[in-house]
Amino acid sequence: MLKLVLSRGREDHGVGVLGYLTVTPLPESSFDARRRGLHVASMDRGTAADAYAKAPWLLGGVKTIAYAINLAAKREAEQRGAHEALFVSADGYALEAPTAALIVRHGDELVTTPTGPTGVLASVTIATTFEAAEKAGMYATHRLMRVSEVVDSDGAWLVSSVRGIAPIRSLDGKEVPFDAEFHEQLTDLAGFPKVRAVR
């Protein structure tokens, strides 16, 4: 995994742009999530789905190196017997995971949460996958989804550049439909190597 971090530099020294690069092997858990899927627990993020429209200073949708909330959510998910958390707005909309975006399938339609007012981080993996899906004749859209739509779907995934395309197998203990053939197609559309999923 290649990670590039850039900052505008130290404010008090006028040093200019500062950056560093790290290269580390992908964790085995990333491949395991692609193969076996994830059991996910929903967690209230504590803000409405449009909270960041009125409060841009909260920096919703900004990638930072402050991972305390993300790590705390993952620990809470594990305490609940899940692999991962799915943040939910205070008004009941599915948002994103701490380090991954959400894709939900309804037939030939792929849906993800919009960025902007939701505070959801823009995802390179979503952009790549949705562009390829539309070229393949699918409909890909950004819209708000109730948590129930994740379970009442034709499949759902948490996606990121590190994790790849990981199917959600259950949400809050409720089984989420899984189609192994479509999972392979979605993995291919996103540009990740195929990893045979375990049913």
Model-predicted segments: where are they?
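Ordered, amphipathic secondary-structure segments that act as subunit-interaction surfaces
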Residues: 1-5
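Helix-start/capping segments and mature chain N-termini
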Residues: 7, 12-199
